[in-house]
Each structure stands twice: as C-alpha cells, then as structure tokens.
Amino acid sequence: MAQPGSGCKATTRCLEGTAPPAMAQSDAEALAGALDKDEGQASPCTPSTPSVCSPPSAASSVPSAGKNICSSCGLEILDRYLLKVNNLIWHVRCLECSVCRTSLRQQNSCYIKNKEIFCKMDYFSRFGTKCARCGRQIYASDWVRRARGNAYHLACFACFSCKRQLSTGEEFGLVEEKVLCRIHYDTMIENLKRAAENGNGLTLEGAVPSEQDSQPKPAKRARTSFTAEQLQVMQAQFAQDNNPDAQTLQKLADMTGLSRRVIQVWFQNCRARHKKHTPQHPVPPSGAPPSRLPSALSDDIHYTPFSSPERARMVTLHGYIESQVQCGQVHCRLPYTAPPVHLKADMDGPLSNRGEKVILFQY
C-alpha cells in the first residue's frame, strides 16, 4: 500500500474567536490535510483537534495583516470559516476532490499528492497497492503474498499454467510477473534447452507452458449403469416391442427416471446385439403381416413352459442378453443370472420338437 507522503489531517478551524467545542477527528492513513487556525503562521502537519468558531466580538476583532486567498477560486476568503490543507487555504465550498469533484466539506479526511486533492476512494484507487496478477486494488484487510516486490491476492498467487494455488513455503518461479509452480517452471527450462539444442529461437514468454498445454486430456465418458428396477421395465418393454415409438420412450423415461436418449440407445444396442446372435430365418409370405419381434423370440414368449405364479416374474430372453451386457456405450448389468435350463425332448409343447436351449434370466 502506498506510504504516507506530505500531508496531514484535515480539520476545520475559525480565523479568530474563543475556543469552540470539539468536532469529530478524521482518520487518514497517508497524505491527509490539516485545517488550522489562520494566524499568519503555518502549523506543522500533525493531527490537530478540530474546532468550531464562535462569533467574534467587536472588541476582540483584530484586522488581519494579509488577505486569505482561496487556492481554488483565487478569491479572498471573507467567510467565517476556511479550510487549510498543507499550508494552503480554501473556501469551505471550494475544497473538492480533483477526480470526482465531490465536495470534501462533510468528509473527515482528504489526501493531497502533487498539490492535487483527492477523496479517500480516488486516492487509493490511483495510488494504492494493486495485485500484480488481476490488477485490482488490495485493501488493508486483504491477505496478500509478496514476491520480488509484487503483491498478490491469495487466490491470485497461483500457477499460470495449471491454475493451482500455491501454499506457504512451496517453491515457485516468477517469469515476467507470471507465477509458475515447480513442475511447470522446470518444463519451461526444458523448453528453452530443447530450443537451444535445435537452434530454434524461443523467447522466455514462449517457453512458458500455456493454459491449453496444462489442461489434462478429457477422460472417457462414464458408462451408464442401470438399477434392477430400470432393467426390469426396459426388458419387459423390449419383450413386447423392441422398437418403441417416442410416446413409449417418454413413458419409460418417466417410469425409470432416465432420459429418453439413454433409453433409446439401450434399445438400439440391444436390437443390434439380438440381431447378431439370432440365426437367419426364411422370409414370411408377403400376405402375412410383418412381426416386430423375431419368430424365435415370439415362440419362446408364447409357449414358455413356466406358467406358475412364482415363475411368472421370469422373462424368457434368448441369447441376445447375457449376465453382463456390453451394449455399445450403455453398460447393462443384471442383478442375477439363472443357470441355463436345458429342455428335454420329451417335454410337451412346440419347443420339445425343436430341441433348442433356452436361457432364462431372473431379474
């Protein structure tokens, strides 16, 4: 913060009269002005007790040896009160900030620098200490870190490359007011050495790792995992319709709490997997209505031999779903995988003639 310069406290005193009651004393840190009693001598720039004059009596009135000329308007001061700052005098109405033109008659303090008068806010804004990183003002209540005569906010004292805030006692490098942690400072040195070995001209600023160079590569997108209840709803819908429309997708999204896009991708991946593991069947006659489910899956659903109420919760799925399904970008997990059940040839029903293996999964 700027050190106090030539100046003193700004107070108000009368030209002549008896001792008045005390006013509020100002609080200035640097370059404050003092308003003293005008008796032809300049008082030292030290805090003085401000006072208010009482009207002078005719008997005690003594004509002044010289005229009091206002430093602002240049006119003689004939008012009862005047303001005196750093051996200069003003009309009460003429003392104002040279930047914002705010009258200082009601202020407790003012600041003077190079014969210019400033209010407290404009003085510290122009001459106060500023952060070397962000350029904002550093106030007396702020915690700071200092390096090579520069002051930094705690949050601003961070590595230019990786943006990591440095701690007390940690090693760092300072390159053209850019703070670097030890790792990126060593990287800068390596860049300079490599450029010198290759004969390439590289400036110091160009050797500093940029923010883009320090950004880590984006991690792989996290796979979506489903709960048992979500899988149960989607698998039941897949058994009925493996290509649901937008309205059905929205219903599934409301039931499962997933987004429509995630559910749509799950159905797409499962259709592709089912198509991959399902053997090709002859094309039905043109007169027959097309079925949205493969014939093998339709037969398994309509002619499943497990019809007891306890096993009604089990859905017959063909080999397109395993215990852990890797469906493209969607990671599907089933809570439990029942062992495969081999249907014997002597069982009744259409499946007994085919002799196929049906894998049952419980969810």
UniProtKB/Swiss-Prot annotation:
One of its GO terms (biological process) is regulation of transcription by RNA polymerase II. Signal peptide: none annotated. The keyword DNA-binding applies. It is found in: Nucleus. Transmembrane segments: none annotated. Residues 19-53, 203-224, 273-297 are annotated as: Disordered. Residues 42-53 have a biased composition (Low complexity). InterPro entries: HD, Homeobox_CS, Homeodomain-like_sf, LIM_Homeobox_TF, Znf_LIM. Gene3D superfamilies: Cysteine Rich Protein (2.10.110.10), Homeodomain-like (1.10.10.60). One of its GO terms (cellular component) is chromatin. CDD domains: homeodomain, LIM1_Lhx6, LIM2_Lhx6. GO terms for molecular function: DNA-binding transcription factor activity; DNA-binding transcription factor activity, RNA polymerase II-specific; metal ion binding; RNA polymerase II transcription regulatory region sequence-specific DNA binding; sequence-specific double-stranded DNA binding. Probable transcription factor required for the expression of a subset of genes involved in interneurons migration and development. Functions in the specification of cortical interneuron subtypes and in the migration of GABAergic interneuron precursors from the subpallium to the cerebral cortex. This is LIM/homeobox protein Lhx6. It comes from Homo sapiens.
